[in-house]
Amino acid sequence: MSSSYYVNALFSKYTAGASLFQNAEPTSCSFASNSQRSGYGPGAGAFASSMPGLYNVNSTIYQSPFSSGYSLGSDAYNLHCSSFDQNIPVLCNDLTKPSCEKAEESNLHNQAEANFRIYPWMRSSGPDRKRGRQTYTRYQTLELEKEFHFNRYLTRRRRIEIAHALCLTERQIKIWFQNRRMKWKKEHKEESSSTPAPNEPTSAAASVEKVEEDEEEED
């Protein structure tokens, strides 16, 4: 056979394939919504027509089984108030009812009272109220003992400084020093009674100590 036979056969094949695209029109990159492809025309139509129920959006297959529970009807959102626990805020049908508003206000008021702290200076100090015994921490007692070792009597200025340093009031500092002086005098009195001293304390020294006590009381 001659080579012209193969050339003619190949040429006829490509011309037959090109005839498929003779009627095709050049379009843009975006596809039209109603355009149909020629290669999928008869096959796709036959497949879609053979199963009409599968491709029908209004078919019962696509109906949600949860439509009754999640519908926007008023019955799905009407929640009844719970009666077994009155302390928990409940959902009511009508949020504008005064009973629901009063329940929310009372709950907020109870929470505010629970979070409210009462400090010692906020408590009443009437004559009928019993005053509790003041307890000092180990650090406060140590610092007060050190100060008492050097000065048994404090001026008002020094008392204010110690009160700020130890987070105490001036009255607490004053009472502690008064009690500590009474204890110190009692201890020294017992020591002096057990071991008699050769010389009695002079009246001048006693008067000086009395003057110091009077000055502290005035401060």
UniProtKB/Swiss-Prot annotation:
DNA-binding region: 129-188
Functional description taken from the UniProt entry: Sequence-specific transcription factor which is part of a developmental regulatory system that provides cells with specific positional identities on the anterior-posterior axis.
Gene: HOXA7
Annotated source species: Gallus gallus (Chicken)
The keyword Disulfide bond belongs to this UniProt entry's keyword annotation: no
Name of the molecule in the record: Homeobox protein Hox-A7
Keyword Glycosyltransferase annotated: no
Keywords: Developmental protein, DNA-binding, Homeobox, Nucleus, Transcription, Transcription regulation
GO biological process terms held by the UniProt record: anterior/posterior pattern specification; regulation of transcription by RNA polymerase II
A GO term from the CC aspect: nucleus
Annotated SUPFAM superfamilies: Homeodomain-like
Residue ranges, annotated region (Disordered): 186-219
Motif (Antp-type hexapeptide): 118-123
Localization, UniProt: Nucleus
Amino acid composition bias (Polar residues), ranges on this chain: 195-205
